[in-house]
């Protein structure tokens, strides 16, 4: 893995952290309308992607392949919408850090399984004991982050 790819992944993560509270503020401006905020978020993203796609060219050739694709390949937009709607709704309920910690745990567990079995067209990358220990350490960190204060207070009061 090159350093540039690692830095890009870090920046993407920072952008995801900004996305949820920005979309939540938009929902508040729309009278707590989570769906409308998600819709506008996607409209802005769609407009941006349209400009990039047109600038890149080759759209007719790429679209010609669309009818032959299985339906599951079109689920990315649905999953993205579910993530955006869920994020907008959950940020004020559980907080941004808790939301993203749990999102990361969900992504980590599912990505380890997807990699291990080579699902949805991924190259098979077996789950090794080292990867498993790393995932457990990350998940333990999330548990401490979410419940550590309560655990400490319970230990102190006993």
Predicted regions and their residues:
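Membrane-interface interhelical linkers
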Residues: 1-11, 25-28, 35, 46-72, ...
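Residue-level signature of transmembrane alpha-helical cores of multipass secondary-active transporters
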Residues: 8-10, 72-73, 100, 135, ...
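Hydrophobic/aromatic residues within the transmembrane alpha-helices of Major Facilitator Superfamily
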Residues: 14-18, 47, 78, 82, ...
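Structural motif at transmembrane-helix junctions in multi-pass transporters
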Residues: 32-33, 86-102
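Membrane-interface alpha-helices at helix entry/exit sites of multi-pass transporters
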Residues: 33-40
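Hydrophobic/aromatic residues within transmembrane alpha-helices
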Residues: 37, 90, 117-119
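C-terminal transmembrane-helix exit sites in multi-pass transporters
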Residues: 109-129
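Hydrophobic transmembrane alpha-helices of multi-pass small-molecule transport proteins
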Residues: 127-147
């Amino acid at each position: 893995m090159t350093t540039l790819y690692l830095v890009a992944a870090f920046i993407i993560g920072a952008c995801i952290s900004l996305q949820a509270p920005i979309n939540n503020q938009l929902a508040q401006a729309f009278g707590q309308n989570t769906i409308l905020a998600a819709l506008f978020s996607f409209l802005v993203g769609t407009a941006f992607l349209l400009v990039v796609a047109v600038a890149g060219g080759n759209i007719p050739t790429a679209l010609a392949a669309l009818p032959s694709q299985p339906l599951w390949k079109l689920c990315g937009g649905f999953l993205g919408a579910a993530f955006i709607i869920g994020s907008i709704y959950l940020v004020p309920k559980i907080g941004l850090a808790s939301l993203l910690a749990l999102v990361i745990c969900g992504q980590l567990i599912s990505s380890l399984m997807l990699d291990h079995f080579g699902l949805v067209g991924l190259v098979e990358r077996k789950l090794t004991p080292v990867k498993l220990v790393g995932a457990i350490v990350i998940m333990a960190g999330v548990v401490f982050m979410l419940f550590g204060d309560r655990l400490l207070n319970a230990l102190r009061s006993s």
